[in-house]
Amino acid sequence: MPPNFGGFFMVRSYYPSECHADYFDFERIEALKPAIEACGISTLSQSPMLGFHKQMDNRIKLLEEILSFRMQGVEFDNGDMYVYGHKAASDVRDEFVSVTEKLMDELAQCYNVLPQLDINNTIDHPPEGDEKWFLENEKTVTQFCRKLAAERPLKDIRDEYNYPKKKGIKDECSRLLEASTMKSRRGFTIQRLMNAMRQAHADGWFIVFDTLTLADDRLEAFYDNPNALRDYFRDIGRMVLAAERRKANDSHADCYQYFCVPEYGTANGRLHFHAVHFMRTLPSGSVDPNFGRRVRNRRQLNSLQNTWPYGYSMPIAVRYTQDAFSRSGWLWPVDAKGEPLKATSYMAVGFYVAKYVNKKSDMDLAAKGLGAKEWNNSLKTKLSLLPKKLFRIRMSRNFGMKMFTMTNLSMECLIQLTKLGYDATPFNQILKQNAKREMRLRLGKVTVADVLAAQPVTTNLLKFMRASIKMIGVSNLQSFIASMTQKLTLSDISDESKNYLDKAGITTACLRIKSKWTAGGK
């Protein structure tokens, strides 16, 4: 006899309700709503208890969805299986029963976790489990959930049960939304780069611009090594650590950061990389290349040459007024005509690299794959044998995210900082992320139940756009998207928020003054 699959649906009754309305303090919930909406459930889910709750909720919903899909049109009668009235072969029935039993066992395992996730506990509390849980599993719920997420991601579940995601419909709405998302992503990347430039200048770090090319005879080695770029930047970080007389296995996050953007040449479509190195201390052996020379026309750092094993690199010191090189006594270089190098602001190199971020989106790079067809015709055969790779913008962890402390700001001020527009500060997206992180820490003592009760109703933006297009028309769709996310200006925010922007030195007016600082030197 096949198992009673219908009985599965009774298990759902053990799932803890998300709406214990009888116990809610509705005034408290209403007071929480603005902060939770501004912070966002995805950010709050980084807290252990809420994160595991959401993880199990999503896992259960997917497994139930797959089970419901598999059971469509399936009936059992005296041991025989019928699919939409047609009797299935015995081997088909046996396989169906075996797979479905495994699916139900996986669901039962997830349901067993749920009672251990006390939604009346705070969202920052790491769940452990009761005595019975320990006897059965010999590990905490935290350890179990982390292992489950690592070893059994939702993608693997879809693949095993042959239940792929439905492909979205490509229409004008989806294209506009995709373009808007990519534009926002590129804008955020550029903000991080420019903020890192600003911070490096303020902290007196050395900034080096580098171009990394790929030699013909090193292409295969580069494509065969998935960690080629990671290893290169790690080696540079270790050189900085060595210069500071620290251990090679120390973290170099506090003394070295990098930003790297790939580009395919417009002439031949050849892949190369533009990198910016930020170093608190120059690697050992770094000396002024113009020292003792009558013509000061050299800018490359000898200490960083020959560190890129896959081709040619050209590490150049970024020079501007009061830069770290000038403070270390380096001479100001001249151009090919012997004239002092043209004065530019310390942000100029940021704008230079930013143009490549704007030039190439992730989708552009994905479409290119190995590079344009014109990339050195003599290498076509070799390239065709290499695996296609997607090269994305790479940067250090938390690169360009540093901001003036927000610990003393009110919750109202933090909410406003998540809604600032670009006109208020060119670093509005970085401020938003920092404010959300601070809010998550403060909301850590709120219970899971309260967060679930206060979370806003989510709207499927794409469906909403498709429904609205009949009223507004395709021509007005772009402006309609912009109007849906209204941003605050300086005139809309409190004095506390304005004071924070002034103290951090990131108002548009303040940065406009700083951008006029020009290069100089000896």
Curated annotation (Swiss-Prot):
Domain of life: Viruses
Keyword terms, alphabetized: DNA replication, DNA-binding, Endonuclease, Hydrolase, Metal-binding, Nuclease, Viral DNA replication, Zinc, Zinc-finger
Pfam families attached to this UniProt entry: Phage_GPA
Residue positions of the active site: 352, 356
Residue spans, zinc finger unnamed: 255-277
Biological role stated in the UniProt entry: The A protein is a specific endonuclease that cleaves the viral strand of supertwisted, closed circular DNA at a unique site in the A gene. The A protein also causes relaxation of supertwisted DNA and forms a complex with viral DNA that has a discontinuity in gene A of the viral strand. The A* protein binds to double-stranded DNA and prevents their hydrolysis by nucleases.
The protein, known as: A' protein
Organism for this UniProt entry: Enterobacteria phage S13 (Bacteriophage S13)
